[in-house]
Each structure stands twice: as structure tokens, then as C-alpha cells.
Amino acid sequence: MNPNQKIITIGSICMVVGIISLMLQIGNIISVWVSHIIQTWHPNQPEPCNQSINFYTEQAAASVTLAGNSSLCPISGWAIYSKDNSIRIGSKGDVFVIREPFISCSHLECRTFFLTQGALLNDKHSNGTVKDRSPYRTLMSCPVGEAPSPYKSRFESVAWSASACHDGISWLTIGISGPDNGAVAVLKYNGIITDTIKSWRNNILRTQESECACVNGSCFTVMTDGPSNEQASYKIFKIEKGRVVKSVELNAPNYHYEECSCYPDAGEITCVCRDNWHGSNRPWVSFNQNLEYQIGYICSGVFGDSPRPNDGTGSCGPVSLNGAYGVKGFSFKYGNGVWIGRTKSTSSRSGFEMIWDPNGWTETDSSFSLKQDIIAITDWSGYSGSFIQHPELTGLNCMRPCFWVELIRGRPKEKTIWTSGSSISFCGVNSDTVGWSWPDGAELPFTIDK
């Protein structure tokens, strides 16, 4: 084939391809035009669609109302439930600087709540975190037993004092923040702000640093406003779906209530608190769902606060010897008897033990029948508080009593630039238990401290 024939052949092929392409384009235009005409003439006729659309619906977990009408379970001792080892892990991992951890349970899970300092362990921002109240403190939570890291934790509220509890439907959180002379408690229900409570004495409004207590859809908390070393003002709040529906101020002259540990028992609420003014035994307040209340002090000569005198003769009023200052704590009332949790040291926040005094709620002697070791006196402890596992969680027909212990490390007792803590928890059982020591165990100082 000579060059002219090649040119003619290639040109013919290109012309044929062009004609075919033109015909296809014309056909496509006609098809679109016909489709448009059909849609115009039949506007209500459904158009078939072969697209596959996936719909994602979040399945809400079944909710119940936590009745709180059961009595405390009979127990003979305490089984270890959790230990987060957060200070040990935080020497190399990303762990929040925290204090005031506490545990609360819904009908599905238990969570550790804690007040962060807006800083991580072994980091420059941990410097000076011995301070209680700052605008950087937040309430966060994580699954019980896990170290409070940024990757496993959930933000709850901006707060330097807090409480939280679950009514069977949603979490209620109470976070107090703001200046000492005008702080405000922000109430959230299911993560949404629902109410606020303004400081009524303008003197460091503060709350429990442990779980509130829920009965039949209502949740109850105790707040303090006023001096930490003399008469202050104390209020009980009844909260439903995050809104305050009733409150009452306690008529409690010569009493001092701070950082109450509250739990439901047979449809009523019992709170055991800290007297920072003049009592080395613990004050209590119990009330029904209408906020009709009774007040007193644990009578036992086995004293529950720290600092405190050696055990001796108790009082159903404040025991003033070594009564100033104190530490958050708890007890569980069983009729006339009481389980008392306390530091082993009478003068510092070290060691921890549980003591059963079979008549200690009402009698003043110092005899007791059981003692279980939790932390050795040579190791640091700190705050402690109660929490309850409802029958809806455990499947029992009673309220399981539990407690947590904060294990404070760092300042002011150790040579670090920071203050933080880990936590352990125990639950009451009516079977075999063991006493031992479960300390924090971190080796200090950290790199940032050197």
C-alpha cells in the first residue's frame, strides 16, 4: 500500500469513528429529552432508583428506674473490685494529673469519675497542682479500673468540686466552678445543662466528691457553703432529670458537714460526712424522699476521721479531741452496727482499714469484732467514699455496698512538683475475703521532678 492509500484509509477510519460518536451523542441527547418529557407529563410517578442507601440507627440501651428500695446486702468482708495503677502507668504513659476520684454505677456499668488539673503526669503543666481550685479543673470519667488517660476518658463538666450518679435512664453530673465568693454548680443530665445552683453564702460552695444517690427516679445530693473551720450552711437537694425540684437547709447548730458519702438504703438516703471544724468522729444525716431528715454523729469510740485521738470513749455528738481538720470518708450503717473505713494513721493520710463495730452507730465503747487491712500504714492513702451497686446491675435482691480509696502521691508529702493519685475499690460480700496491702506503688520522683 502506497502512502496515498494509507492516508485515505486512515482518514476513512477516523471519519467512521467520528460518525459513530456523533450518532451516540445524538442518541444520548434524545434519551435525556424523552426522559425529561416523561417526567414533565407524569410528575407524580415514582422514579425507580437502584442506589443502595445504608441507614445507621443507634440502639439505645434499655433503661430502667433504679428503685433504691432494697436494703444493704448482708456482708462479712470486702473483696477487691478495682485498682487503676494510674501513677505507675503515668510515669511513661499519657495519664491525667487528678485528685478526688470516685466511682458510681448505672444499671449497666461502673465508671470512675475524677477531677483533672488540665495536665498530664510527668509534664511541665503538672507543676503546682497541689492547688484545689483552679479554672483548669474538669470532671471526667472512664471505665472503672482503667487509668484516667485522654484516650479513654469522657469529659463531663468544668469543676473543682463534683458529684455524679445514674437514675437508670441517664447520668446526672454536678460540677462546681467559679470564684470562691460566687461559685455556681452546673447540673447536667445526659450531658445537657439542665439547671444551676448559685453559692448562697458566697464562701466556697462545695459538694460531695463522691456519688449522689438515686431512688425511684429522684437523685439527692448534699452541698456546703461557708467556713471550713466553724459553723457553715448545709443543704440537701432533690433533683429529677437534672432539675432541682426541692431543697432544704439543715438546722444543724454545732454540726459541720463536708464531702458527704451518701447511699440509698430501703428507700431512704444515709450520708456520712467530714467534720472539718471540731469532730474526730463523723457526722451523719439521713432523710427520706420528702427531705425529712435526722442528724447525728457516729457514737462509736472507734473514731473514723484523721487526725483523731486513739480509740476510747466515743460520743453521739462531736468528739473535739484532735477534731480540727479532717479527711473525706464513709461508713455503712447496719441497724445499730457500723462498718467504719478509716486511715490507719491517727495523724496523717496513710494506711487504710475497715472495722466492723456491731453497736457503734448507737453506743460509745471502742470494742469491735472485725478488722480488714486495705493499705499498710507505711503507704499513702487519702480520701475515701462509698458507692452502691444496685440490684439492677448485680442481679441480687439487695444493695451491694462498695467503697473506693484515693492513694495520693506527690506534694505536699513527697518531693515532686505535682500532686495526683490513683485509686482502689472494694465491694462487700458474704463470702471469703482477705486483708492485705494494695498500695499505689509508683517510684518517685519522676523525670520532671529532677
From Swiss-Prot:
Disulfide bonds join 73-398, 105-110, 165-212, 214-219, 260-273, 262-271, 299-316, 402-427. It is an enzyme of class 3 (hydrolase). It comes from Influenza A virus (strain A/Chicken/Hong Kong/220/1997 H5N1 genotype Gs/Gd). One of its GO terms (molecular function) is exo-alpha-sialidase activity. This is Neuraminidase. Inhibited by the neuraminidase inhibitors zanamivir (Relenza) and oseltamivir (Tamiflu). These drugs interfere with the release of progeny virus from infected cells and are effective against all influenza strains. Resistance to neuraminidase inhibitors is quite rare. Residues 11-33 are annotated as: Involved in apical transport and lipid raft association. It is a single-pass type II membrane protein.
